[in-house]
A protein has these predicted regions:
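NAD(P)H dinucleotide-binding glycine-rich loop of Rossmann-like/cofactor-binding domains
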Residues: 75-86, 118-173
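Glycine-rich beta-strand-centered segment in the early N-terminal region that forms part
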Residues: 31-45, 60-121, 138
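Short N-terminal binding/cap micro-motifs at the start of the first secondary-structure element
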Residues: 20-25, 49-51
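Conserved hydrophobic/aromatic beta-strand scaffold that supports enzyme active sites
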Residues: 24, 39, 96-98, 144-146, ...
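Residue-level recognition of beta-strand termini and adjacent short loop/turns
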Residues: 18-20, 34
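Eukaryotic N-terminal low-complexity, Ser/Thr- and Lys/Arg-rich leader segments
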Residues: 1-12
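Cytochrome P450 core scaffold surrounding the K-helix E-X-X-R motif
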Residues: 50-55, 126
Length: 173
């Protein structure tokens, strides 16, 4: 693992522990990155309507359910930020953060890099939707967040997934 300055062992985090039940955890563990994982310090996080839906629905939200395919149960068990079903999660999927540690197999990102997160994990379907950062994988309402290297993009936005406009929009649209 490659890391920057001292990383604390615990942090403050907002955790969703049940329907309409948010708690501030002043001693949530700061996870160390595995081989293909990144640990980043959160610089900014936004909340939106989908966070409110998760707050109300909790385990019944389609993106809070278990991954059906794309990763083996063994790999999922090795990811401490994978929290499907009734496990508490950390909401917050709109985030800018700075990488503070990387796993030894991470090749496309470096410590100190500022990144955005691609929320939707389309290659990890659940029973009713797709897995997502801030749902069945912990989000960014915490000081440090652990992520797979494939879900971050550099903050310039040049590699972010923005759908192309294929038709000219009518005037006044």
């Amino acid at each position: 693992m490659t890391a920057s300055a001292t990383i604390p062992k615990t942090q403050y985090a907002v955790q969703l522990v049940g329907p309409s039940e948010l708690r501030v955890n002043p001693e949530k563990e700061v996870f160390q990155p595995g081989p293909h994982q990144i640990l980043a310090k959160v610089e900014a996080v936004g909340l939106c309507f989908s966070d409110l839906k998760l707050l109300k629905q909790f385990k019944d939200h389609a993106r809070k359910s278990e991954v059906m395919k794309g990763l083996s149960a063994e790999i999922l068990a090795s990811i401490p930020s994978y929290v499907p079903g009734e496990k508490p999660t950390v909401p917050g999927h709109e985030v800018v953060c700075r990488i503070v540690a990387i796993g030894d197999q991470v090749k496309q990102h470096t410590v100190g890099e500022r990144v955005l997160v691609q929320t939707d994990y389309r290659n990890l379907p659940t029973a009713g939707s797709n897995s997502a950062f801030g749902y069945n994988f912990e989000g960014a309402l915490q000081e440090y967040v652990l992520m797979d290297e494939r879900v971050v993009v550099d903050a310039s936005g040049e590699r972010f997934l923005i759908p192309p406009i294929v038709e000219r929009l009518p005037d006044g649209a």
